[in-house]
Amino acid sequence: MSRIGLKTIEVPDSVTVTKDGDNITVKGPKGELTRYFDPKITFEQKDGEINFSRSSESDKALHGTERANLASMIEGVVNGYKKTLKLIGVGYRAQAQGNKVTLNVGYSHPVVLTAPEGVTVKATSATDVEVEGVSKQDVGQFAAEIRAVRPPEPYKGKGIRYVDEYVRRKEGKTGK
C-alpha cells in the first residue's frame, strides 16, 4: 500500500491546480509550474483538498511519486525553494550578475554558469551564493551544478558546499 499516495494534499486558496491532457499546471503567488502527470494516476479535487487513486496495484510506486511531485509543486508556487552554498578556500569568490554566476575557485580561469529559466541566483557575500526558484528540481539541479565545479575535499575542507552540509574530514599522511 502506498502510504504517501493515500495522503491528501491541502491546496491553499491562492493556488489553482488544473489538468490539461497529460499535463498538470499549478499556479500560485510566486509563479506557475507545468509538468507531465501520469494518466494511470487520477486525482479528485474538492473542498481545497486533492485525493489520489490508481487504476491498478502495479502502479503503487507511481501513486506516491506523483502525489509527492504535486505536493512539491504546490509548495514551490506558494513559498518557493532556496539553497545556499558556501565557498571555502583562500581567494574563492563568487559574483552574480543577472542569471549568471561567476566563480573564482582556484582554477586558472573564472567559471561562469547560467541559471535555467525560473531560477534566480545571487551572491549575498563574496563567499555565499543563494539559488532560489519555484521548481524544487531546477533549484536543486543548479545548486548541484555549482557545487560540482569544486566539491569539498576531505583533507582541508576547501571547496563549494551547501550551508547545512557536513564534510567528513580525513587525517593526512603521517611522516616517517
Swiss-Prot record:
Source organism superkingdom: Bacteria
Assembly notes: Part of the 50S ribosomal subunit.
Cited function: This protein binds to the 23S rRNA, and is important in its secondary structure. It is located near the subunit interface in the base of the L7/L12 stalk, and near the tRNA binding site of the peptidyltransferase center.
Protein's organism: Lactobacillus helveticus (strain DPC 4571)
Residue pairs linked by disulfide bridges in the UniProt entry: none
Residues in coiled coil: none
A single cellular component GO annotation: cytosolic large ribosomal subunit
One Gene Ontology term from the biological process aspect of the record: cytoplasmic translation
An annotated Gene Ontology molecular function: rRNA binding
Pfam short name (any one): Ribosomal_L6
UniProt entry keywords in alphabetical sequence: Ribonucleoprotein, Ribosomal protein, RNA-binding, rRNA-binding
Protein name in the entry: Large ribosomal subunit protein uL6
Family that this chain belongs to: Belongs to the universal ribosomal protein uL6 family.
PANTHER family linked: 60S/50S RIBOSOMAL PROTEIN L6/L9 (PTHR11655), LARGE RIBOSOMAL SUBUNIT PROTEIN UL6M (PTHR11655:SF14)
